[in-house]
Amino acid sequence: MGIHEIYIRIWTVAFVGCMVLADAASAEESARDGVIRKSGNLRVPDHDAGDVAFLMRQPWNQKNNHRKSYYPAIFIFGDSLSDVGNNNNLITTAKATRLPYGRDFPGAKPTGRFSNGLIGPDFLAEYVGLPTPPPYLSAGNNILQGVCFASASSGILNSSGNVFGEHLPLAKQVTYFANVRQALQAMLGEKGTKNLLGKSLFYFNVGSNDYVTNYFLTNGQVPSLLQTQYTPSQFEDLLLSNLVLRIEELYAMGARKMAVVGLSVLGCLPAQRLIRKGSPTTCVESINEIVRSYNIALLNRIHSLQAAHPDAVFTYLDTYRFIDSVIRQPSAYGFENVLAGCCGSGRFHGLPTCSIPGLYKVCEDASKYLFWDFVHPTSKIDKLVIAKFWTGSYPDAIPYNLRELALVP
């Protein structure tokens, strides 16, 4: 058995074991952890931290949808950063259906969102003036104002996330969108469907799992299977070629306003820092270097898509620079801990044990944390990021922020 197979089996056993333990015990149990770690030895920020008050000013209120919406519908593609419940309907260990997930969500209940509360699509929908798009697997005919296809553990490649069980890779999400388009045609006719899709927002936040649960699956000392097959540059090209292919498929089905989110600081994730034995105050720079290269190449691909399709509008949304700024200057944004998860166990709370009774600790105030668990952000940082996407300017949004994109003819 190869070493990469051993690592895959270890991860599989760990996650399946967690699910068995979770099913055998109460999901209501919680604990508190007051451990706070300060960040240090990091670069001077690129962002002006003084805008945090403005970014937090907009409240989330799904009832405030009487105003005219900026887009008629929102279609979301991605992974657990955007999954609002699709994985609830799949056989997978990648589920967020037990407390403390959702403890700060309206009603204080888990919904399948990998967060303490609301996530990106919720905040985005509020800005747009629409309800949060329903998860495709339980949407039924509720599709006129958009659908969320995002699935936890999924990636651009079909193989990414297989260690967790069933998921909807990007290719499957696009296939499901074709089903939605067909249903829309039955409701609105071809002309009505074309008009709706041409004005709707197509939002992509995908690619993290292709690295975290695939390319960077091992501890860095032994290469993963994909690392033996592809150099970082070759793997980057593989991902982007597949991503562009899916975007082209959506364009052919009528998508005309598309926003693509770059990767965040994957080298700062508690799980990666635990696996690679990172220091208490710094991130794994070798991973972040690869992420920065990917983001630059992604922006170039978006420029190429725009040149190839002048009747559509594409924009790039940068999350890396803002999160990096928060990590380097946490107090300016109201954070106290930016390198460990609020919920979990192990060093940096980098183990995926949040919601497993008896195996996790959880902080008292998630708003002081950047990370909620081993890889996912807290609701607070999601709100800040979406505010940047909505009102930000270069280099947070290139060439348009999401509000400007809506107003482009």
Regions found by a protein language model. Give the residues of each.
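Conserved active-site regions of diverse hydrolases
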Residues: G2-P409
